[in-house]
């Protein structure tokens, strides 16, 4: 674990929890501390416990009231987790915001029903309402916790901050001496080319701050204003898709996923024996594992899906970009070199998702003919060129 001035990141985090708890127990705060919370925020129990190297931090406004009847199921889960029981935060939790979050994260390749060390969930305001779960948010609550939130970001050092709602965005940007215009609607802020806003940690490392709609009922209604489907998440899924290029271009992911994957594909390309094995592979016939290729392919496929590279809306993207199926199937070098980032990603997803099962070849035939390598190299080239 990285250290700052000789103090471990874990020790910094534990000291932050102690300082926040002391501030709320001082009696000078309108909001209260929740004694069941052994983390900096109750949302950490969903994604965040031990995730001090998380790359994506989800930021809400405030958690609400843990003593409210609607929070009873979650609080039982948290109490069980404090006792060392293997219980999910989301168990028996039918909160519409949380259920929508599951769907939105799934749309970018994350399964938040399981523990994911890349994610850290928190609220900007770290205290708790005595009653009521939403509405009547006070700027003074955020101002009181701004110092603590900035410390949290400096400890975790995420690449991406996902801000749910305008008040959350304004609070987060305020910690970094940045602002958001009050002259335009929040929907315009979300859709702006200036989203995300890039801020810097104290050592100059960039953090990408995304404006997103709150995915509760009211936030979803506001995001869908002017559309016929008031509770659809489609607009929000399009908003969330903008997060992926920033996530994919993370230097950590470049080193641990993109570069090793491309190296593996180049080794196959250079070996006639390995290419022949890929061409002959079938899930319906016994195969001798050639130099661990079966294991290598499984890991490659798992990592590609896990990192959200196999986008679900690839067909919609192909149609939008007028990409011809035959050209996508061949993925010839000269053509691939003309593709935009989203075009190349859509083509790669096509090769992963199209029906290989009639011949049982899975992705292997697209690897054998070099299509996957050419597309991966194109994506990598565009990612490293991102500002």
Feature-to-residue mapping (PLM):
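A polyanion-binding, active-site-adjacent surface
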Residues: 2-180, 207, 212-227
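Short terminal alpha-helical segments
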Residues: 253-310, 371-374
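Repeat-associated, polar segments at repeat-unit boundaries in modular proteins
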Residues: 307-310, 314-325, 370-383
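A hydrophobic alpha-helix/topogenic segment detector
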Residues: 179-254, 261
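Short, charge/polar-rich alpha-helical segments
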Residues: 326-342
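Alpha-helix N-cap and loop-to-helix initiation/capping positions
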Residues: 137-141, 227-235, 366-370
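Heptad-repeat amphipathic alpha-helical coiled-coil interaction surface used
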Residues: 262, 341, 345-349, 355, ...
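Charged, low-complexity interaction regions
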Residues: 273-287, 309-311, 335-337, 352-367, ...
